[in-house]
């Protein structure tokens, strides 16, 4: 399963990502805010604009996976996403650019912490720290 994700910060592109199998398919709803990897480990916030059964990428090209959902329910309704798409077409912009200028700063950023629980220790860190560990 794949998804078209609109980035909420520059470069504001709409990109295709694979949806991880650790969540059931019905969990990934359009309008959900997600954290996606961009470049060398940097995480960006994006909105799941549409789900796809198949990727439109050429053969041999692999998709990165969505890193993590940032909410459990969709942030944006279909009406708001349609409005953003229409405004983007009229202004010659990407939908993520429109949404990125409308949503509050806190929703355009990723502040994600990962916590590992092991039998011998409890370890907590931010995603930025995890990428430095690898």
Which stretches of residues belong to each language-model region?
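Accessory, non-ATPase domains that flank or precede helicase/AAA+ motor cores in DNA-metabolism machines
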Residues: 1-134
